């Protein structure tokens, strides 16, 4: 595969209905791959679209009293509309009813026929209309029901044209075992087993007596092309046809993003056709099942997540969870609750909080001017931070080349976590209280290193979150018209825009809040909230929340029994994130880790006496078994214990850093 071009495709989706979350996953993956390789300086092309032929579509059109072309025209508009809502981009939206595609299919059919790779034969077997295929014994149950669609098959006998898969099968098995068709280990084994057990050849036509909705065979006017043969050829149509594909650098660096359920078609039949045509076989990026609540999404289970369920959360929330939880090829378990929690933890509390803290302190202590490094005063933690950040671009490149996108995100978030810990240890808010040159230089170094990490991360995850990372990079003074050079820029850790005056501090990712008990219950269910409650947009918002202080110093003493006291569980917590609450003069919003009890959102009325930066990564005491309290700005899930100091300030009770997170105060 060359280092100048990349051609990425999704499967062309079957035009039998509207998109679901699985379609969004594949399309998002194509977009992420495209942007990543663009940022490495490569020319790219992307293709998605609809597979619009076949008996199933013809039958559906009849059931709604429409012509097949009218039905697919309407669906194509709907698919484009939904893709637009998620800001998905593509160079080609392929439709198999287009004149260009029909011409390409006709030409390829004739070439394969003239070569002797297509012949006429008769077949009797069990046919699944939904699969649009004859099934083998392994693909049916004891009642001859399709294992995928759980419906009875039809016993059919008919004459069709066949493609000689067996002629190319030994060569295909060899390519599979060498990892040249798919490189993901689990799918090498799965595809090899499919190839070694495959018998016979591939039926590539259907008689017009059964269906007329297809591309007519050039050598027999009584047959139309089988929908799968027709559909696979769309990838060549996207290059400009068979002749263009012979010499195209895009075709020679093509990657098909496909679901594991269509592995046989893309990993066995498609290579056979390409070998017949003398074309290079693209590599496959196989995706796993999309689960919800531990089960494969299914209309019968009621756990399908529709685009309408995801829109209120936004594309970034969906993308972060889908590609943070598992690498492509592994199954991904999505619920609205998981998507919300991961967004808040990774984006709002992760890079969003790091950007807010760093840029706010630059504004406060350096009048908004990015400080220069003081390399001569660099400490060991800073050298290690710089080394980790400088090595990250190569690690992310390798991860992408191997379709390990979750690993790429994990390595990036490890850098963010290290930077958060570094800031907590260096306490820049304390350094800012001193006016001496040494403290000033240390403060400059802390903020310069934090800025460099933000710049590095901004370039490396722009493929996932393009709009927000563009905002971040622009805020840092970077030229986002040079994104084709992003990885080279990210390699130079120290190349920050020192002296650049911040014009804006972006709020990159605002937390997604659950604003009602019913919404919280809906989020915890694998069934989408819009299905459970009939309301999606009212269940969540991205705005913040007035309340009273979380605790205050007692003025009188009231005796209670030991039994009463034992009801209160006070635990050690670590403040992971702290931020000002917009619209409140009293509150801080805290994200506190209680170890095995997980993360809690807690509102504390101590904003007057302490800054968010002074709280992060500190060990505190939390009353952990209080009932969740609904406030104006959200739900508070505990109480931060505070007390009044000698100077009148109300401050948290900090505890020894050696105390175990989540442990119960005794």
Question: Where do the language-model regions lie?
Answer:
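Secondary-structure transition/capping motifs at alpha-helix termini
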Residues: 1-2, 35-43, 64, 85, ...
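N-terminal catalytic cores of NTP/NDP-binding nucleotidyl/phosphoryl-transfer enzymes
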Residues: 2-75, 94-110, 114, 131, ...
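Structured secondary-structure scaffolds
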Residues: 2-48, 100-104, 155-364, 408-412
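A glycine-rich helix N-cap at a beta->alpha junction
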Residues: 75-89
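Cys/His-rich short segments
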Residues: 115-169
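Intrinsic disorder at enzyme termini
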Residues: 472-564
């Amino acid at each position: 595969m060359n280092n100048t071009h990349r051609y990425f495709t999704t499967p062309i989706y079957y035009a039998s209905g509207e998109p679901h979350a699985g379609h969004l996953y594949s399309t998002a993956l194509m977009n992420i791959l495209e942007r990543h390789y663009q940022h490495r300086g490569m020319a790219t092309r992307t293709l998605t679209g609809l597979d619009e032929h076949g008996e199933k579509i013809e039958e559906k059109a009849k059931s709604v009293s429409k012509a097949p072309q009218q039905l697919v025209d309407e669906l194509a508009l709907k698919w484009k509309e939904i893709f637009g809502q998620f800001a998905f981009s593509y160079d080609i939206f392929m439709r198999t009813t287009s004149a260009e595609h029909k011409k390409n299919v006709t030409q390829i059919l004739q070439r394969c026929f003239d070569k002797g790779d297509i012949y006429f034969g008769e077949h009797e077997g069990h046919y699944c209309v939904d699969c649009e295929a004859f099934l083998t014994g392994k693909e049916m149950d004891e009642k001859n029901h399709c294992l995928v669609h759980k419906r009875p098959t039809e016993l059919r006998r008919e004459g069709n044209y066949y493609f000689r898969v067996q002629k190319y099968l030994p060569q295909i098995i060899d390519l599979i075992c060498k990892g040249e068709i798919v490189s993901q280990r689990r799918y090498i084994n799965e595809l090899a087993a499919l190839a070694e057990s495959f018998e016979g050849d591939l039926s590539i036509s259907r008689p017009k007596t059964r269906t007329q909705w297809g591309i007519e065979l050039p050598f027999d006017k009584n047959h139309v092309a089988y929908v799968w043969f027709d559909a696979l050829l769309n990838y060549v149509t996207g290059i400009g046809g068979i002749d263009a594909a012979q010499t195209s650098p895009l075709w020679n660096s093509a990657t098909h993003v496909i679901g594991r359920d269509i592995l046989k078609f893309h990993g066995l039949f498609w290579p056979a056709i390409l070998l017949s045509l003398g074309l290079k076989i693209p590599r496959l990026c196989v995706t796993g099942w999309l689960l919800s609540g531990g089960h494969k999404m299914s209309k019968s289970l009621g756990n399908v997540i529709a685009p309408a369920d995801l829109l209120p959360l936004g594309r970034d929330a969906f993308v972060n969870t889908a590609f943070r939880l598992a690498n492509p090829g592994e199954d991904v378990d999505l619920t609205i609750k998981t998507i919300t929690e991961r967004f808040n933890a990774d984006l709002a509390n992760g890079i969003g909080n790091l950007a807010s803290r760093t840029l706010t302190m630059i504004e406060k202590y350096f009048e908004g001017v990015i400080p220069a490094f003081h390399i001569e005063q660099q400490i060991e933690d800073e050298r290690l931070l710089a080394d980790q950040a400088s090595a990250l671009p190569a690690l992310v490149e390798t991860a992408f080349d191997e379709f390990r996108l979750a690993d790429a995100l994990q390595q990036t978030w490890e850098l963010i976590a290290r930077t958060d810990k570094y800031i907590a240890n260096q306490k820049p808010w304390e350094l800012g209280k001193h006016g001496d040159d040494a403290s000033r230089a240390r403060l400059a170094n802390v903020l310069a290193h934090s800025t460099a990490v933000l710049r590095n991360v901004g370039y490396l995850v722009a493929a996932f979150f393009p709009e927000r990372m563009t905002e971040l990079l622009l805020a840092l003074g970077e030229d986002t018209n040079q994104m084709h050079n992003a990885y080279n820029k990210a390699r130079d850790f120290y190349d920050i825009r020192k002296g650049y005056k911040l014009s804006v501090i972006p709020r990159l990712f605002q937390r997604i809040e659950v604003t009602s008990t019913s919404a919280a219950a809906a989020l915890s269910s694998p069934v989408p909230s819009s299905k459970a409650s009939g309301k999606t947009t009212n269940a969540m918002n991205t705005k913040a929340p007035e309340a009273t202080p979380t605790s205050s110093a007692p003025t009188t003493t009231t005796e209670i029994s030991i039994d009463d006291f034992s009801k209160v569980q006070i635990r050690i917590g670590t403040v992971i994130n702290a931020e000002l609450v917009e619209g409140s003069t009293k509150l801080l919003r805290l994200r506190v880790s209680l170890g095995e009890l997980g993360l809690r959102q807690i509102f504390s009325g101590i904003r007057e006496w302490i800054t968010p930066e002074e709280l992060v990564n500190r060990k505190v005491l939390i009353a952990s078994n209080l009932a969740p309290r609904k406030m104006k700005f959200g739900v508070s899930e505990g109480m931060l214990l505070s007390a009044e100091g000698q100077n009148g300030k109300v401050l948290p009770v900090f505890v020894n850093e050696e105390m175990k997170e989540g442990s119960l105060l005794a």
